[in-house]
Amino acid sequence: MDHQNYQYQNPFERRPILKSKAPAVKWIKEWVPQDIVATGGKCHLHKWVTEDTFSRLKEKEKEPDVPEPEPEPTTEILFLCSYDGCGKTFFDVSALRKHSHIHGERQYVCDQEGCGKKFLDSSKLKRHYLIHTGERNYICTYEGCGKAFSLDFNLRSHMKTHSQENYHICPYSGCVKRYAHEYKLKNHVAAYHEKNGGGETPKYTPPAEKVLRTVKTPATVCGPSSDRPYACPYEGCEKAYIHEYKLKLHLKREHPGHLQEENADTPTLNKHNGNDRNEIDDGSDQDVYRKHASNGKGQTHKQQSRAKPNMRTPPAKVGKKGSTSSPAKARIAKKPWQAKETFEEVEREEEEDSEETEEDRDNVEDGWRFGENNEDDDDDEETEYED
């Protein structure tokens, strides 16, 4: 080793500091927004960030936030009446506002002796006066009806009963009930069909194929203003009915000879093969059906004759050869329909149309749910004239 070229380096000698070309990074402590993965929300953390990151956060805060679409409500919103003891609910605020009037002060009082009823407004008081005066100036112009009403609204509702397309027919088989208003049909189904577990109520159903004929009644028994157009044609019998099939039941029970005379014009002849004789056997529909079921030609004639059921009382059987029984003993007494009286009583209760009111229908359409208020039972009619 060449000792002359060797240079001694002192380890404690201070070395010169070399300056870096890159500028120093500036750190700032700031609240930084962070996303929460678990819940999907957001939070802010107080931590150190560089100056560049801090400037980007400031620019992002200046951008407007895009509003997120709100989810559609899955629950039904109801408006509850806050009056103490009421508790009725409504679908919209307008129905609640209309209902709230019934809880106001009733300052219009009827001055008739012994009445003293109070009302919320003068129009309802004027309508109430019609009960005391008995005025019924709105008369039905339909031929054969002549019903009178105190309010034009009740007359318009009644006129719908004379139009067939406005009827709501009961969907249950065997039930012939029909109503001019849908809510009446719902009440009928709930009372007679759903209450009995969906069973059919015993009813007399007239055949659909038969064309009903209008019975011409004397003017002295049933005038043009009567609501029972089907009257008994027999002199001295003042029975009148709203439906034609009820008149037929009455004639069948009280005047059996009338139906026998009516059916005598169109007798049914049963032709048999290989025989020159024609026999009339009206003992029962089942016997006639059995006879023609075994005969080829008579089967087609039976199908045509059974298209229109015969409602007359069966006369005595024609005596056959070798029979010693008299025609009087051979007469068959047809048993009366057991459920007829019950059906007539139910029909009589529902056949009279009560005067309906505008507020009754509004309550059904508005759909108040819970609670009952009997204070406004007297105010269930609406008039179109207001103060």
Curated annotation (Swiss-Prot):
Mark the C2H2-type zinc finger spans by residue number: 79-103, 108-132, 138-162, 168-193, 230-255
What would be an example GO MF term here? zinc ion binding
Using the record for this protein, list the coiled-coil segments as residue ranges, or answer none.
339-367
Query: Pfam families given for it?
Result: zf-C2H2
| Chain residue ranges for the region called MED18-binding | 201-290
Q: Where is the composition biased (Acidic residues)?
A: 344-363, 373-387
What does the UniProt induction comment state? Induced by abscisic acid (ABA) in an ABI1- and ABI4-dependent manner. Stimulated by stress conditions including high salt, osmotic stress (e.g. mannitol) and dehydration. May be induced by ABI4 but repressed by ABR1. Repressed by darkness but induced by light.
Q: Name one GO biological process term.
A: response to light stimulus
Function according to Swiss-Prot or TrEMBL: Dual-function transcription factor with both repression and activation activities. Binds to 5'-CCATATT-3' motif in target gene promoters (e.g. ABR1). Also binds to G-rich DNA motif 5'-GGGGGCAGTGG-3'. Regulates the expression of genes involved in diverse cellular pathways, including glucose metabolism, photosynthesis, phototropism and stress response (e.g. salt, drought and osmotic stress). Regulates plant immunity, especially during necrotrophic fungal infection (e.g. B.cinerea).
What is the name of this protein? Answer: Zinc finger transcription factor YY1
User: What is the taxonomic lineage of the source species?
Assistant: Eukaryota, Viridiplantae, Streptophyta, Embryophyta, Tracheophyta
